[in-house]
Amino acid sequence: MKKNKLALALIISGLCAAGTANAANDRYIIQVDNNKKGVVKALAKKLGGDIKVDGNGFIAAQFSGHDLASVKGLLNNPHIKLIEEDQKRVPMALYNDDAGNAMQQQLTPYAVYQSQADQVTFDANAGMKVCVIDSGLDASNPDFIWGNITGDNDSGTGNWFDNGGPHGTHVAGTIGAADNNVGVVGMAPGVAMHIIKVFNAEGWGYSSDLAHAADLCSQA
């Protein structure tokens, strides 16, 4: 294997981390052992609580008009471990590409912000190579330094430099698009890349092809 190689797997998703807002509608989480939950549920209902969730080791109940201190007083019971506000959770903010026309100016892809790659400095002399296993790379795209790019073909999907759908070019661009005042600029502009085309135009590939691609990456 060559020195200082880097194989990257990028997973850009819309999964959300939790942020907090205010407690929702006087709703509280009550932690309690499962074998004592029946007693606590009965007490909560007796005191005006509306059971919303019956979970493993806890219940969530709404006590209209009661703040946290008053609910703790109402449920002064040895079986209860903890009472806390049932916080609303909101998704982590999604990042967008810079506003503008990529044909007229250079934009930064949203994933650069999402991964916080814009907060670190890229060392162009580090001897780094990134292997991208995806749907190929569009050879007609001028936003890459093609002298820094190699690839391997796949028997099922064809040449790595034939675009098998936009995803591979998008991912490769997010990683290494050139800093050339047009299109997009990647996390590591102009970085050496090795492209392996596994996913077809329908967006899928075989597990065996993916495993083989990983081996090819280690040899690139």
PLM features: what roles do these ranges have?
Residues 24-31:
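Short glycine-/aliphatic-rich beta-strand segments at the starts of folded cytosolic domains
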Residues 32-107:
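Autoinhibitory propeptides
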Residues 102-192, 209-212, 216-220:
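Active-site core segment of subtilase-fold serine proteases
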Residues 2-22:
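Gram-negative bacterial Sec-dependent N-terminal signal peptides
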